């Protein structure tokens, strides 16, 4: 093929592409401007933690002005930490809403994969018989922005800000083994149980709490006669209702505690850690409660 024929073929390809692409060079009025989207993560103290690795993955649902899903995007930890922009272009809607959720577990991703409308988007905890699995370190955020038309030049870059949606809990129960032995001869886990609750089990896509009430079972261990839980996460309660920590033996609820000895309630704070310290060793029950920054366990003086 000589140069003249190559030129003619190239021109024809460009003309056909222009006809089907909808953006003719002589008239850009119907052309959506491309733009870029980035994700930015914040902690409870409004510190930018995008680059810390706290966000492992993000799923971003894109809805038009009617709430209909038009796209679904995924980002991994490296992309988020590097603030890598996603190039986007949407032709048709006047506005789009980006509904971003970070660190959903595989079950949540599977449940939301085929959602086609924002009103049907929920992030529900896995649970059995009212006992929920501890959620991951969930973040979420929503950004609504107009789609710019009339040019093929780069449009305004956009950033969706995401914030933590769970609270951490850490529990220490001094003298727990001795207390158990005083209430029966058997060993864990045959007859004893510890439950913390209740919270709703569901977030809507727009981060509103709904759903059924659930409890959590701390997966702790007995160390030198004391029960010590790992750090675990819970959904917040409704209307700052306090959590109740219940201790069972032989299926009977023997203790139900919802406040410290000073009256401070067990209220989980989003993006913070709720520390619960219970001392069963003395004649009188002693309960301490404090709220500390994320991942910071309260150190209690021993006496």
From Swiss-Prot:
Function in brief: Anchoring subunit of the major fimbriae. Regulates fimbrial length. These filamentous pili are attached to the cell surface; they mediate biofilm formation, adhesion onto host cells and onto other bacteria that are part of the oral microbiome. Fimbriae of P.gingivalis are major virulence factors.
Superkingdom per UniProt: Bacteria
Pfam families on file: Mfa2 (PF08842)
InterPro entries attached to this UniProt entry: FimB/Mfa2/Mfa3
Position of the signal peptide: 1-22
Lipidation (S-diacylglycerol cysteine): 23
Protein name, UniProt field: Major fimbrium anchoring subunit FimB
Other information: The name (major fimbrium subunit) does not indicate the abundance of the protein, but is derived from the greater length of the major fimbriae. In strain ATCC 33277 and strain ATCC BAA-1703 / FDC 381, major fimbriae are 300 - 1600 nM in length and about 5 nm in diameter. In contrast, minor fimbriae are only about 80 - 120 nm long. This length difference is observed only in a small number of strains, including strain ATCC 33277 and strain ATCC BAA-1703 / FDC 381, and is due to a loss of function mutation in FimB, a protein that restricts fimbrial length in other strains.
Lipidation (N-palmitoyl cysteine): 23
Membrane topology: Lipid-anchor
Organism encoding this protein: Porphyromonas gingivalis (strain ATCC BAA-308 / W83)
Compartments it resides in: Cell outer membrane
Family under the similarity heading: Belongs to the bacteroidetes fimbrillin superfamily. FimB/Mfa2 family.
């Amino acid at each position: 093929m000589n140069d003249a024929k190559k030129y003619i073929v190239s021109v024809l390809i460009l003309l056909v592409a222009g006809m089907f692409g909808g953006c003719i060079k002589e008239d850009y009025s119907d052309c959506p401007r491309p733009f870029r989207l980035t994700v930015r993560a914040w902690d409870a103290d409004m510190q930018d933690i995008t680059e810390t690795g706290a966000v492992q993955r993000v799923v971003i649902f894109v809805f038009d002005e009617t709430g209909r899903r038009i796209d679904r995007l995924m980002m991994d930890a490296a992309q988020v930490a590097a603030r890598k922009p996603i190039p986007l272009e949407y032709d048709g809607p006047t506005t789009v809403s980006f509904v971003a959720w970070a660190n959903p577990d595989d079950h949540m991703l599977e449940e939301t994969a085929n959602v086609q409308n924002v009103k049907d988007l929920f992030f529900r905890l896995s649970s059995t018989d009212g006992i929920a699995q501890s959620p991951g370190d969930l973040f979420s955020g929503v950004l609504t922005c107009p789609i710019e038309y009339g040019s093929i030049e780069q449009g305004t870059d956009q950033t969706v800000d995401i914030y933590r949606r769970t609270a951490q809990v850490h529990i220490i129960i001094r003298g727990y083994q001795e207390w158990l032995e005083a209430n029966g001869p058997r060993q864990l886990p045959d007859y004893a149980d510890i439950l913390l609750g209740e919270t709703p089990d569901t977030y809507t896509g727009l981060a509103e709490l709904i759903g059924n009430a659930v409890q959590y079972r701390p997966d702790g261990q007995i160390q030198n006669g004391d029960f010590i839980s790992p750090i675990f996460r819970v959904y917040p309660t409704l209307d700052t209702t306090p959590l109740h920590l219940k201790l069972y033996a032989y299926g009977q609820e023997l203790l139900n505690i919802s406040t410290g000895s000073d009256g401070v309630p067990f209220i989980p704070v989003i993006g913070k850690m709720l520390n619960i310290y219970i001392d069963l060793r003395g004649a009188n029950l002693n309960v301490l409660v404090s709220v500390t920054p994320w991942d910071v366990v309260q150190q209690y003086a021993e006496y």
